[in-house]
């Protein structure tokens, strides 16, 4: 059951009080506020004092708490007043007993701070939490309490690191008014905190604010001798271009007119595949700038889409392809190769690129990818490498592509047979002897001897010697084939070599004088062997 007092509190506040209620009755009902008059509820957010003075319920709660009027405080809390205002009023009136009564209901005193403007009360409330001094300023920044910041201005003026921390906090909260206040009142001229936070949070307004502060305050008043190079030293353009923030780039260019800016933008855009930036600036570029941008993209292994975009604005001349080839080889960047393979003159491009690959004796996954992309016959690269004496490349390719000994020998011999460059042929034949010969047996050795005799290999004498030692009778048959070989390929060194072995076989009794005169008339007529 409700008492009469509680019943009146529940049913009368929203109604006009009866005229016969005198002050004594209202006091008994708890609807009288000493020194203020009658009090009744008016809606959800206000109270009516003495039936003509309407004030917010929280304001009334603050006043009652400052007067330490427990009864009215309790009444206003029952009328949905905010307990925070009771604490604020108690702090204003220095009422520790009232604070202790309600303090255990407050989970975090920081939540009270947004409702306080007075710096002293702000400070009192905060120290109830037993936080560090810096935290007071963080809260002041967070809730834009300029009076609190002004109150502690003397402390901040002597502590620049703390000032910078507050700037960072304001930047993170996108609190532009506080940032302005700090720069205008605390004489801080280090704006990197603002710019870095603006870039980190992609906050263009904050970024613009940084430049506005530079030109409106630093340059005219503090450092009038500064020129635009100071801004360049901040390397802001590098950062925003690397992030791909086109709006930030355009804002930077309004203030920073360094002639190298466009190169910085293109380099970063090509490196980090920011095609939106490239698309915006390409119409403003010279052919040479686009070409250089393409080379940077190759160097940094840009995506195919970025490379395609740049190539679409260039004419693929032989000169440009040679430059591309050099970058492909130097930086092992092959995305461009697959793009060129789709172009109309891909064979021309292929020859140039292959030449550059072989010239630099490159063999790794990129060469293999190039061979696969263009369906290149490995023999082609082998012959190109032999021509310019890149035999290590020949070794690597032959071992990688032709695992089987017989297959490797077959392809290498075919490369020799189809090659016109004599020095290159000799190198390949020497390569066969050095890397394949030790695997050979019997018929393979005699077959190689015939092959060497046809192509006048430098190692012919060594192979002939092994054939003679291996099987003198079969070597006789080999020599019987040599007149035909020599007849078709007149080569003095080869003839002299055959002549020497004929003499040796004659001395061993394997060949008779009659057989020699019958089968080697050309040699005998030219050289007196016996």
Swiss-Prot record:
What the entry lists under InterPro entries is as follows: MGF_505 (IPR004858)
One Pfam annotation reads DUF249
What family does the entry list? Belongs to the asfivirus MGF 505 family.
Functional summary from the UniProt entry: Plays a role in virus cell tropism, and may be required for efficient virus replication in macrophages.
Q: What is the name of this protein? A: Protein MGF 505-1R
